[in-house]
Amino acid sequence: MPYVWCGLIMLALMPTHRPQHKHIQTQPQRTPTSVAASGGDARKMFDAGLTAFENEHNQAALDNWRRLARKEPRFPLVHLFISFATIDPQEQKRELRNAQALAPKVSKRDRLMIQWLSGVEQEQYVPAITAMNDLLASYPRDKHIVFLAGRWLSSQEQYEQASRLLQRATQLDPAYAAAWNQLAYCYAYTGDFSNAFTAMERYTALLPKDPNPQDSYAEILRMAGNYRDALEHYRKALQIDPAFQTSQLGIADTYALMGEEATARGEYDKAAGKANARSEQVGYEIQSALTYVRERKPKRSLALLDSAASQAHNAQASLLEAEAYRDMALIERDNQQSLKYLDKSSAALAEASGTPGPELHQERAEVLRLRAIRLAAAGKAEGAKQALKELDLLQQTTHGTALSRTYAGAMGSVLVASQRYAEAVPYLEEDTRNPLSMRDLIVAYTEVGATDRAHVLELKLAAFNQPTLEQALVVPELRTKLAATKEKRGWLRKLMGSD
């Protein structure tokens, strides 16, 4: 994490109000707004959208907020939250401009909220975090502000800091369902599944008729390697709402992780058949193509990804097109051919002018990362150095934590390719949520004699259960290796829930 972020985020976690006697009952602050009809229909419509947004029902939230924006065009927060939730790049830019134009005329709270969330969207992280801290200090008992801060920190993979804020949100309102959901994920991402399941039980009890709690429970069970129970909860979500697409995708991804690839492809087809947009359908087709990687049929996977890239291009989904070509570059063993796929990915990104900055920059960073690694593997040190230089400039310009980890992982993997193992270790240790970096770190640990660390990391990597291409390329092969190693077989069985 960039040093400036550390200090700013720690400010967010400091006490922001005087301690109160335990016997005094306090009420959470009501969220003030600048809308003229804040006590009437407009307020109710905004709150309905906010509740839907917090519980991952983005389309319902957007429907409420778009209606409100037409009714109350001078309500700044509705424009801000539309820009934050929409997947339409043009709408995102337009609504963000509307919110910023109204910012000078609104309350302190609304102004700080606009500074924070617009700063995040525009990758101006230092002023954004400063505004977030001011909000938390000025409105310490506003559960929505505390929750949104925790949610955003979680999205930046700052799980321990996020957990503290989300715990505070649940203390302000023990019935705050969305906070329990996000808190459960924070626990799960740090490996604390016991507390994750406890928080998830609270979440599902609070919203028994909502599909999202069952979907979240399923995902966390899957992260823990409990695939069968995960499938059961995904199916419960679909029983509540047969149109809840994330659970249909979750079923497909779970079968893929289980190694039941043909079944997974059938489930991806179901998801694609119910897709609301062509770009969404292409995304499912990309995931389906990855099942052939797990079956060790790379040519079939490459052919399907090439088709998906063409479809994405026709649908003007440049980011998906770039992702498909980058996936092809990852799968391709020949370095020269891999670099050609990366050229196509870069060309697609050049056409993605309407894509929000954070998403575009992260995809560009991943392309540069892989380019540097493949050039180093091909013995082209100067080319690798140039790619790393471009990646470093990108992460220094934006100060994003995800970009910083991508740079660290790229630097470490290039050093491993150059057999500079001791130098690689500290870089790779900054990117230990990426299976490719974890694999290279195991190699580096082994080469420098840190075999105990290598063994521990092998077990952690074997328990990685995210449905990504990186996982498909690394984890199944590692599990096979561990299963053949007598002294590690027992650990693997425990990790896979076989005992």
Please name every model-derived segment:
Residues H17-L166, L172-A178, Y185, T190, ...:
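Acidic, proline/glycine-rich low-complexity intrinsically disordered segments
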Residues A42, P76-L77, S107-R109, K143-H144, ...:
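Helix-start (N-cap) detector for alpha-helical repeat units in TPR-like alpha-solenoids
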Residues K71, L102-K105, S138-Y139, Q171-L172, ...:
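Structural marker of alpha-solenoid helical repeat scaffolds
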Residues L50, F84, L117, R151, ...:
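Residue-level recognition of tetratricopeptide repeat
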Residues F53-E54, I87, V120, S154, ...:
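Position-specific recognition of the canonical hydrophobic site in helix A of tetratricopeptide repeat
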